[in-house]
A protein has these predicted regions:
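N-terminal Rossmann NAD(P)H-binding glycine-rich loop of SDR-like oxidoreductase domains
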Residues: 1-24
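Alpha-helical membrane-targeting segments
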Residues: 38, 158-181, 225, 230-269
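Mid/C-terminal beta-alpha module of Rossmann-like enzyme folds, strongest
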Residues: 194-257, 271-312
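NAD(P)H-binding glycine-rich loop region in Rossmannoid oxidoreductase-like domains
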Residues: 34-38, 42-93, 97-101, 112-118
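Short alpha-helix in the Rossmann-fold core of NAD(P)-dependent oxidoreductases
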Residues: 84-88, 107, 126
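Conserved glycine-rich Rossmann-like NAD(P)H-binding loop of the short-chain dehydrogenase/reductase
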Residues: 24-32
Length: 312
């Protein structure tokens, strides 16, 4: 039995589908919510309902579980996200329950740049969570991924919404000079599933990214081409972008850019470009070749919907 936290999210739905397609039995850990969860369509899974601060619920969810994929995190909530409760305390509770249950493998999805000494909240939280996992005594695999993209992501769809909602120009933090390494979601998930049967990948931390380095400016230009929207790209200092984003996050229920994303874009976020083919035998898709999800969508309407829709 495999338990997946965050199994209804962007990565989780794809991971659950691939695991089931490969013959694994999967249980999704759902947090209590009034809203109907976005379970993977047409995929046979079990469900356990528990928040990450409910130790009794977590113990019940672990019954019969041999492998845990921990995907849940607070960054998707933007400035309203509680990194301490979800990424740090939640990971500590989940690893404790997994250790008590005799779990044999624990996967954690982290970020390039994760470090408990980081000045950036998300990367610091991920670094602290990694330490909990390494010290838990459970055989682990930590995947520090680059920016992921695909249908329903926060990255390319967020850019598409910003382009649609921008009046002729788009502000680029530091001129879009930051170097990134976007990795297609399905390639990343294939790495997660493939490594499950590889003993050499136990008790290891892997940094993985896509097969090309692109500046943020290049990425925005490619997204403009895919969506058919041209905008003047205006360089802006991150010292100005950050307080502006803080204000926008406070005004609107949701916003396509969060302070967490701006922190992530302060420095280059890359790793060895050959990591995925060398370690996993997968040739990662090029960024421009996997943007069909951006075409033919009324992004202006989606932008307004995001601004005024509450989180579940």
């Amino acid at each position: 039995m495999i338990l997946v936290s965050g199994g209804t999210g962007f990565i989780g739905r794809s991971l659950v589908r691939q695991l089931v397609e490969n013959g694994y039995t999967v249980r999704i850990l759902l947090r209590p919510s009034r809203r109907t969860p976005r379970l993977p369509v047409g995929v046979n899974v079990e469900v356990a309902v528990s928040s990450l601060d409910d130790t009794r619920g977590l113990r019940a969810a672990m019954r019969g579980v041999k492998t845990v994929y921990h995907l849940a995190g607070g960054e998707g909530e933007g400035g309203r996200g509680n990194l301490q409760a979800v990424d740090i305390d939640g990971t500590a509770n989940l690893t404790a329950a997994a250790a008590d249950a005799g779990v044999e493998r624990f996967y954690y999805i982290s970020h390039l740049g994760a470090d408990r000494a980081s000045a950036f909240p998300v990367l610091k939280a991920k670094g602290i969570a990694e330490d909990y996992i390494r010290k838990s005594g459970i055989p682990y695999t930590i995947m520090r991924g680059s920016i992921l993209f695909g249908p329903d992501d926060n990255f390319t769809t967020g850019l598409a919404m910003l382009l649609a909602g921008s009046p002729g120009l788009l502000l680029l933090p530091e001129g879009g000079k930051t170097l990134l390494q976007p990795l297609w979601l399905e390639d990343f998930v294939s790495c997660l599933v493939w490594s499950l049967e590889e003993p050499d990948m136990v008790n290891q931390v892997f940094e993985i990214g896509g097969g090309e380095y692109l500046t943020l400016r290049q990425i925005v230009e490619i997204v403009m081409e895919a969506t058919g929207r041209r905008r003047l790209l205006v360089p802006v200092s991150n010292h100005l972008m950050r307080p502006l984003t803080v204000v926008l996050e406070a005004i609107f229920q949701r916003f396509p850019v969060s302070v967490f994303w701006l922190d992530y874009l302060v420095v280059n976020r890359t790793c060895a470009v050959d990591t995925v083919p060398r370690l996993f035998g997968i040739m990662p898709a090029r960024f421009a070749s996997r943007l069909d999800h951006l075409r033919g969508v009324r992004w202006g309407r989606e932008y307004l919907r995001m601004l005024f829709t509450r989180h579940g």
